[in-house]
Amino acid sequence: MRAQTLPAGSDHAPVLACGAWLKNAACLLRGAEVLWSPIHGDLGDPANCDALDQSVEQLLDSAHGQVQAVAHDLHPDFYSTQLAQRLAARLCVPAVAVQHHHAHIAALMAEYDLREPVIGLALDGVGLGTDGTAWGGELLWVSPSEWCRLGHLQSLPLPGGDVAAREPWRMAAAALHVLDRTGEIGRRYGAVVGEQAARTVAAMLERQLNCPRSSSAGRWFDAAAGALGVSVRQQAEAQAAIALEALAADYLSALSPPECVGTYVVDQDGVLDLRGLLEQLFALADEGQAGQAARGAALFHVALAEALVGWAADAAQGHGLKTVALGGGCFMNGILSASVQAGLAARGLQALLPRAVSCGDAGLALGQAWVAARQPTAALAPQTHLQEEGAPCA
């Protein structure tokens, strides 16, 4: 177990949080102290589920009394969710569901003991949204007592569902589809993945068969990697994004950043649309010159950071706020996190990243616990299941 001390003045009722599905870690929030379990890994492995079972019992023993609630992710099928609900029933306390991206920003609010609202940028691979769809590129308004979704990245179809997250060429095919260029999928990817596979994915996209949509920032990284020929299939999580970052770092260490013109727009609903950037990446790939993949990788990072800064800064100005919290696993990308922080600072805003916990799912439990600890006392009736919803934004 690892102890973390929150800023002086923090005082929280004891809450147990069971964490996420990927990179799972649980925590006990009590007063100004957070007691962390080890990182168990992904809960698709039964051994990791057993380890989580043991950890939560140790955390409960460390509470030295009754916890007020047990917090968990919004997704009902996660083992961590089901465990939290069983524990809550056993302890006669409420189980509190906390939306994934809200929890990412809440973890920052807990770490910095923020008492006023912030704008949150939560960028990662996936998390269940309050509307039942897959989120992952979220612009949020978050206060200690409530939150709402201000906007999100333009959603992309995922041909084959979760398979698309493992095969960046599928996300590149999805990018072609949203650019009304579905007919190019076979020509661009047939020789690499097989003509039949390319035709099948093109047909799935045309007919919207098994193509759930997601606003995930991680899938935009995959689409960029696939468009530039950097990655076709991944052997590990975020492999394509890491390769893309490495190429961008090499380019930017030797050359000036590429110009970003016409790479994004934000619509009236707060949706950040990067299709202009996709068009430019495919154009670079078509040039076929040495070094164009690295230039495209640099362009993707620079343009994405510029878009995120403008998007968040406009939201902060519109809501009269000065702080932007940056959460989610995509901010492990050093180029992206440094560029967004610098860009926001240039706009007179304070940009916060986690210091003591991971910005990814390994730090999510702190946000879950912080949100649950702030539920109205009257709502925390024994054996209730509370599902927090983002309030409509003004």
Curated annotation (Swiss-Prot):
Keywords: Plasmid
Signal peptide as annotated in the record: none
Keyword Membrane carried by entry: no
One biological process term in Gene Ontology: protein maturation
Alphabetized Gene3D superfamilies for the sequence: 1.10.357.160, 3.30.420.360, 3.30.420.560
Classification via Pfam families: HypF_C, HypF_C_2
GO molecular function ontology, one term from the record: zinc ion binding
Protein family (similarity comment): Belongs to the carbamoyltransferase HypF family.
Protein name: Carbamoyltransferase HypF homolog
Organism: Cupriavidus necator (strain ATCC 17699 / DSM 428 / KCTC 22496 / NCIMB 10442 / H16 / Stanier 337) (Ralstonia eutropha)
Taxonomic path: Bacteria, Pseudomonadati, Pseudomonadota, Betaproteobacteria, Burkholderiales
